[in-house]
Amino acid sequence: MIFPILPVISSPEDKQSIDEFSLVGQVLFPIESVSPKKHFIHQFPHDLDIFVNAIDNATTDQIVELLNVGIKQVFVNEKQYHDAIEAGSPSSRFVVAVDVPSTELLTSEASFVTSKPFSESDLKKYNANENRVIYIESNFTQDGAIELAKNYVPVIPSTKLTVKREEENKISISAVFVSTLTTDRPDGLYTTLITTPSPSYTALGIVYSSKDSIIAAIEEKVGVYQSRKRRDELWYKGKTSGATQKLVKLSKDCDSDVIQFMVEPRTGYGFCHRETKFTCFGDDIADSPARGLPKLDSTLQDRLENAPEGSYTKRLFDDEKLLIAKLKEELDELIEAKSKEEIAWECADLVYFAMVWCIKHGVRLADIEKNLDVKSLKVSRRKGDAKPQYQEAPVNSSYKLEIVSVDDAAAVERAMTRPVQKTADIMKLVLPIIEKVKSDGDKALIELTSKFDGVKLDAPVLQAPFPADLMDISEEMKAAIDLSMQNIEKFHAAQLPKEKVMTVETSPGVYCSRFAKPIENVGLYVPGGTAVLPSTAMMLGVPAKVAGCKNIIVASPPSRATGKLTPEVVYVAHKLGAKCIVMAGGAQAVTAMAYGTESVLKCDKILGPGNQFVTAAKMYVQNDTQALCSIDMPAGPSEVLVIADSNADADFVASDLLSQAEHGVDSQVILIGVGLSDEKLNEFQAAVERQAKVLPRKDIVAKCLAHSYILLAKTYKEAFDLSNQYAPEHLILQIDDAPSYVPDSIENAGSVFVGALSPESCGDYSSGTNHTLPTYGYARQYSGVNTATFQKFITSQEVTEKGLQNIGKAVMELARVEGLEAHRRAVEIRMERMAETK
């Protein structure tokens, strides 16, 4: 129930009166004093409702404008009311001046204001069984106000009111308030509920009030209650303990027998007599009030003022670029989330970073809530479309590739230019993760898996042998994996050196040798979570096994939905003889393998694809001498380049392009056509469109094709020159006599698929070649993963007496020129000794 007085204040500029009477919870301004701008309401206390008197003095547009900025109710006459209702305004937002309300008004949710009391029977009829507030305006005395306050809310100018017990020629608001209270308690006290204000609205406890304590509380604007032990004393909350309270608002319940004190407790103090407790109704400690968003709000404010050095939250406050990057990252992750649990998890992350941004700029949760309240009070709505810069560009529903002639150098350069990858912002996010895992080890892995993957683990590592129930897959899947691993092993075993030691006699008596040794500890990163990627585990693990790596460590995040590892990946790890599986993903998994933790063996090399965070972490650790860890290769978006001529099957070509386009909107898809007629070109375009329309990921395909190209070459040489310039991850040859062009015409490519019956899909899974390949043009200097990727090659030399005689003088001369005397002497001493023994 509202306080039984509505103070009239002459202007919003009268801050003193607003402050004095804000505990009433409502004030009325004349319309002449109000300028309804966008943020008009925000100048007032959060729990103060604003009313405006516009009777006979406002148009419908002006009234709607008042309602839109958050005015709780507008006082109007009946004509103004009807016009506003016709304009679509809700009746509940009006206080209508009436003598005798019409039937239409009586069936509405509007409040009334009258200048004289109604008869008892009319009052009962008009107040809708006490569900409608009726205000009354008059030239009140205190006794008159007390009498009318039983059934009405007196509207009284603030100049005639006082918060004191009594003041000459003024009406005491406390006298009016207590006159409306009732109680059935023998001691005559009133049950009183103590709560906090926005944003927590926490119930602190139950106390008891007397008329005297209420009068004192209103006058002093503090928490004052009645002591039940000492009836002749008032209880000033916190007078001895320091746990004082500021009175924000006073109200009563619908039966007028329970009072609500809304108070602001002193920071760091609770309400309960058990001094460590914030509220009598829970276990929250005094210096950590509330839960959820209110707790986050108070915690972040404390961190802003008192955060220790090294605090992540302080780092966010200090590094605005990092905070902006995290906001964008978390919004993207929320958009990508699918399950109820995943959406809630990602939304919580986004809210945290949004609140950091707000607190950094002086905005509290109560300010946000007030804006929500104001927006909920709007009566006219805009269409609500996104601003142009955020509207998604129309999808290329025609699924057409842009056609470029090789004679147009600028267009060719545009078609073959890959998107720029920005790593600086990503590294700002990755470095804190790396440092956390380095310092906290297993504990950090458990925390970060909970944070990023939504899975709470007891331990971050699954040791071999792996439980059978964690690799429970169908017999069909087992057969597919077994066949694929067999072919991959056969191809990679053939890459092993044909002889254990390769030796060459470079000069008579000088024997140079080279031999291969496996890298001892290798870490294989297999993306997981929502994806099922046993093929990646096979492509990385089988060559490691063939090379003879002693310890194979697999890292893969558990599924958010099940909390478990992908069973197909566990099965592959079992077949590989992996030592363990690190149940983590992202930069944290890479860091754990690079530096080691209590339960993760430090790896000498880390391999495997991943998102931008995985790539950034791999690039970082390979350059950190503390890690002493190498990686397979840099990574970028997946890509395919198809060379096709006029005899190529259009459906085959289209399927190869689309199998790459469905990977993601940033995938690269290029078709180089050799000597194509317009008819053949149209045949290719039609096949792409026909197949794309029926794909489950057709929207992703459409976006990819929107920046994909067909380059028209005149000759095969021209086509291969363009391909070598681009250096594709996958090169597919659908041309006549394709094998004849391999290897002489190919300089730069990750893997080549020769002929019409060699789709990329075969290489991705089961043919035997490796699908972990250089992207983004790195095929110019990197190979795909192969057996040698898991080996290091050691050289040795044996120099005999004859050999030293043959090369000794050359060595000494070169050492002399370079000024390395000890080098020269190392040979000279030996040659002198040989001469002495002759």
Swiss-Prot record:
Annotated InterPro entries: Ald_DH/histidinol_DH, HisE, Histidine_synth_trifunct, Histidinol_DH_CS, Hstdl_DH, PRib-ATP_PPHydrolase-like, PRib_AMP_CycHydrolase_dom, PRib_AMP_CycHydrolase_sf
Region (Histidinol dehydrogenase): 361-838
Phosphoribosyl-AMP cyclohydrolase, as annotated region: 1-271
Cofactor binding, per record: Binds 1 zinc ion.
Region (Phosphoribosyl-ATP pyrophosphohydrolase): 272-360
Any one GO biological process: L-histidine biosynthetic process
Residues the record lists as binding Zn(2+): 660, 663, 764, 823
Single GO cellular component term: cytosol
Segment forming the signal sequence: none
Active site (UniProt): 729-730
Catalysed reactions listed for this entry: 1-(5-phospho-beta-D-ribosyl)-5'-AMP + H2O = 1-(5-phospho-beta-D-ribosyl)-5-[(5-phospho-beta-D-ribosylamino)methylideneamino]imidazole-4-carboxamide; 1-(5-phospho-beta-D-ribosyl)-ATP + H2O = 1-(5-phospho-beta-D-ribosyl)-5'-AMP + diphosphate + H(+); L-histidinol + 2 NAD(+) + H2O = L-histidine + 2 NADH + 3 H(+)
Record keywords, A-Z: Amino-acid biosynthesis, ATP-binding, Histidine biosynthesis, Hydrolase, Metal-binding, Multifunctional enzyme, NAD, Nucleotide-binding, Oxidoreductase, Zinc
NCBIfam families listed in its UniProt record: hisD, histidine_hisI
HAMAP family named in the record: HisD
Protein's name in the database: Histidine biosynthesis trifunctional protein
Organism: Candida albicans (Yeast)
Lineage: Eukaryota, Fungi, Dikarya, Ascomycota, Saccharomycotina
Designated gene of the protein: HIS4
